[in-house]
């Protein structure tokens, strides 16, 4: 506990809360170019090959984005749109790549939750 004199000399500094998605810089989405597309394995109780991409954003940030859904057409130099949202079992993955936007195709044969995966309405 500081004394009154200590508080007069240097007042209390308000702690800034850390941002969960700093690379977006307050934007809802950001555009970027894939620099590497690869698979990685999740944390302990889970087991899979999760598809992720390293993306260089238009503001210069380099982030890792998760590619949701079954199958994808992304490769190096693909232009993608990124949104916030982490993947709990992949450390360091704090962004999602939007499906059906720019170079990313929607998920084929998707019947439910289509808007999340950029899939058109089946005929």
From Swiss-Prot:
A molecular function (GO) held by this record is:
tRNA binding
Protein function: With S4 and S5 plays an important role in translational accuracy. Interacts with and stabilizes bases of the 16S rRNA that are involved in tRNA selection in the A site and with the mRNA backbone. Located at the interface of the 30S and 50S subunits, it traverses the body of the 30S subunit contacting proteins on the other side and probably holding the rRNA structure together. The combined cluster of proteins S8, S12 and S17 appears to hold together the shoulder and platform of the 30S subunit.
List GO terms (cellular component aspect). Answer: small ribosomal subunit
Q: What is this protein called?
A: Small ribosomal subunit protein uS12
The superkingdom listed in its UniProt entry is Bacteria
Q: Which family does it belong to?
A: Belongs to the universal ribosomal protein uS12 family.
Question: Which PROSITE patterns has this protein been placed in?
Answer: RIBOSOMAL_S12 (PS00055)
Matching entries from Pfam families are given as: Ribosom_S12_S23
Which residue positions does 3-methylthioaspartic acid occur at?
89
GO BP terms, alphabetized? translation
- Give the UniProt keywords, A-Z: Methylation, Ribonucleoprotein, Ribosomal protein, RNA-binding, rRNA-binding, tRNA-binding
Task: State the PANTHER family in the record.
Answer: 30S RIBOSOMAL PROTEIN S12 FAMILY MEMBER
Complex and partners: Part of the 30S ribosomal subunit. Contacts proteins S8 and S17. May interact with IF1 in the 30S initiation complex.
């Amino acid at each position: 506990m500081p004394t009154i004199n200590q508080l007069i000399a240097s007042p209390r500094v308000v702690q800034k809360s850390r941002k969960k998605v700093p690379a977006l810089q307050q934007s809802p989405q950001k555009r970027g170019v894939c620099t590497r597309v690869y698979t990685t394995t999740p944390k302990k109780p889970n087991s899979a090959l999760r598809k992720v991409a390293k993306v260089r954003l238009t503001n210069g940030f380099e982030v890792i984005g998760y590619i949701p859904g079954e199958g994808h057409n992304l490769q190096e130099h693909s232009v993608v749109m990124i949104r916030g949202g982490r993947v709990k079992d992949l450390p360091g993955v704090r962004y999602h790549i939007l499906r059906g936007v720019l170079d990313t195709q929607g998920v084929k044969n998707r019947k439910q939750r289509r808007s999340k995966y950029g899939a058109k309405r089946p005929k």
